[in-house]
Swiss-Prot record:
Keyword Calcium set for record: no
Tissue: Produced by the medulla terminalis X-organ in the eyestalks and transported to the sinus gland where they are stored and released.
GO molecular function: neuropeptide hormone activity
The protein's role, per its UniProt record: Hormone found in the sinus gland of isopods and decapods which controls the blood sugar level. Has a secretagogue action over the amylase released from the midgut gland. May act as a stress hormone and may be involved in the control of molting and reproduction.
Protein localization: Secreted
Identification of the protein by name: Crustacean hyperglycemic hormones 5
GO cellular component: extracellular region
Signal sequence, renumbered to the chain: 1-34
Major location category of this protein: secreted
SUPFAM superfamilies associated with the record: Crustacean CHH/MIH/GIH neurohormone
Pfam families linked to this entry: Crust_neurohorm
Disulfide bond annotation, renumbered to this chain: C58-C94, C74-C90, C77-C103
The species this protein was found in: Penaeus japonicus (Kuruma prawn)
Length: 125
């Protein structure tokens, strides 16, 4: 092995290592910077502020699990179509709308449609 090749390999290794470390630092800093003040609040504050996110027109049972399932369906629908209004329209009128039905039909197997429709009825009474 020539001495020149060894120094070149060492320089290449250092450059790659430096680039990897810089990438890790940037990724760590950006993920730490995305935490909202809601994430940093006290646990009792979190439940109240998260409840405010849901549509006040949902006058039925406030069940966090059911609302979470319905919200996730709308989020998944937005992630598939990437249309700005999909998630908002899907959640409008407490999930009782055509956009929600279309998302449900597109994303969920038919065997779960009835369950989701029952969940909409339960939270939107």
């Amino acid at each position: 092995m020539k001495p020149g090749n060894t120094s070149f390999n060492m320089v290449s290794f250092r450059m790659v290592w430096t680039a990897m470390m810089a990438t890790l630092l940037v990724a760590g800093a950006s993920s730490a910077g995305t935490r909202s003040s809601e994430d940093l609040s006290a646990p009792e504050d979190r439940s109240l502020s998260k409840r405010l996110v849901f549509d006040p027109s949902c006058a039925g049972v406030y069940d966090r699990v059911l609302l979470g399932k319905l919200n996730r369906l709308c989020d998944d629908c937005y992630n598939v179509f990437r249309e700005p209004n999909v998630a908002t329209e899907c959640r409008s009128n407490c999930f009782y709308n055509l956009a929600f039905v279309q998302c449900l039909e597109y994303l969920m197997p038919p065997s779960l449609h009835e369950e989701y429709q029952a969940n909409v009825q339960m939270v939107g009474k």
